[in-house]
């Protein structure tokens, strides 16, 4: 099997210091290659990019016209937002849409984030001063056979929003890919820097309610840090009120985020309202488990309690509010052996056959 891969809103590269978006791309490609697929990527290639042992890179501006002569079984499109920063033309991103339209074969859209549905790009182009460089018919998606593979278990809200070029949508547990791509780690709970840590972005304030519920207002003897692009001035003063504030850390790369989580006792996995509607469990759930964190779940978010199968883990790790969370963190701080045993039990509970997982992913692409 041979698949061409493009990414909306970002380049594809295998350099050091990648962000979450690029990590998602590389993880998907690792799933493909472990499942026996040969992968070529079409992207903007820079001289500084190092050669990857996962894929061959083609500079999209030079090679987009050759894609149909290379006998691909599918074109895979990874979700993202295309932005023209400062109004500048981004040829590589516009050519992604040309490839979607012109590819003579199966087009698969990978929907990790339910808010990153495939959108028409021409409305963002037609008023730009450089719009005359492009033909509308090459960019407006008219095909109706695009296959969506998504980690959203409830597809109805996606259908309600309308899926551009949709032929069919199918659930696959993409949220489990950190079990393949994150390196397992054992935390020394007697020497952690923080009791509770969360890595994330503001996401337009869509997680403000949950962030305040679980990371604000905790007792003074529970140390809390939020890091990423989160800042206190983003939060509503009225909603925060006089609650004790967490510390705010800096923005980091994906590797740096993992390194920080390895120095924390616990985290809480939360989600947007639309994540709840679509029953989309975050990749962070499995990533934090593999990294060794005690991983609490917002019970309102993962309402089916499908992360863990062990009833005792479900009982302890699903929390309704900051009161329950604080009580359980105190139990962990008081008995670090219990914390270590719990961290190991989490890993064992979520363990899967990785070869089978990747083979199932490739089979899903073939069958959809």
Where are these regions (language model features)?
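Nucleotide-sugar donor-binding catalytic core of glycosyltransferases
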Residues: 2-61, 77-98, 111-314, 354-357
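Short amphipathic alpha-helix with an adjacent loop that forms part of the alpha/beta core around
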Residues: 54, 61-70, 332
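Short beta-strand/loop segments at the ligand-binding rim of alpha/beta enzyme cores
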Residues: 104-107
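Hydrophobic, well-ordered secondary-structure elements that form the walls
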Residues: 288, 325, 346
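C-terminal "capping" alpha-helix adjacent to the active site of nucleotide-linked donor transferases
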Residues: 317-338
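A charged, aromatic-enriched C-terminal amphipathic alpha-helix characteristic of glycosyltransferases
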Residues: 333-367
């Amino acid at each position: 099997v041979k698949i061409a891969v493009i990414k909306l809103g970002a380049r594809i590269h295998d350099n050091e210091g990648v962000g979450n978006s690029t990590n998602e791309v590389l993880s998907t490609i690792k799933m493909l290659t472990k499942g026996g697929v040969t992968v070529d990527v079409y992207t903007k290639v820079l001289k500084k990019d190092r050669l990857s042992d996962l894929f061959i890179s083609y500079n999209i501006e030079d090679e987009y016209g050759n894609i149909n002569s290379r006998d691909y079984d599918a074109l895979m499109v990874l979700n993202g937002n295309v932005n023209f920063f400062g109004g500048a033309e981004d040829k590589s991103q516009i050519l992604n849409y040309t490839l979607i339209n012109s590819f003579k074969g199966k087009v698969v859209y990978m929907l990790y984030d339910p808010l990153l549905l495939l959108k028409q790009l021409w409305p963002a182009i037609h008023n730009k001063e450089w719009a005359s460089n492009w033909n509308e018919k090459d960019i407006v998606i008219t095909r109706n056979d695009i296959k969506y593979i998504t980690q959203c278990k409830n597809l109805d809200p996606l259908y309600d929003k309308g899926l551009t070029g949709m032929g069919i949508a199918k659930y696959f547990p993409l949220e489990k890919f950190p079990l393949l791509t994150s390196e397992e780690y054992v935390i020394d709970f007697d020497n952690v820097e923080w009791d509770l840590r969360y890595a994330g972005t503001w996401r337009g304030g869509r997680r403000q309610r949950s962030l305040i519920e679980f990371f604000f207002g905790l007792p003074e003897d529970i140390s809390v840090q939020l890091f990423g692009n989160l800042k206190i001035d983003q939060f509503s003063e009225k909603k925060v009120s006089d609650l004790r504030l967490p510390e705010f850390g800096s923005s980091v790369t994906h590797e740096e985020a993992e390194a920080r989580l390895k120095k924390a006792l616990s985290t809480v996995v939360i989600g947007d309202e639309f994540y709840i509607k679509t029953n989309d469990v975050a990749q962070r759930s499995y990533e934090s488990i593999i990294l060794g964190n005690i991983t609490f779940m917002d019970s309102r978010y993962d309402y089916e309690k499908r992360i863990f199968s062990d009833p005792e883990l479900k009982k302890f790790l699903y929390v309704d509010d900051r009161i329950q969370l604080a009580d359980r963190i105190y139990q962990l701080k008081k008995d670090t052996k219990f914390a270590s045993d719990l961290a190991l039990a989490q890993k064992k509970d979520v363990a899967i056959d990785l070869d089978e997982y990747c083979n199932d992913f490739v089979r899903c692409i073939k069958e959809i």
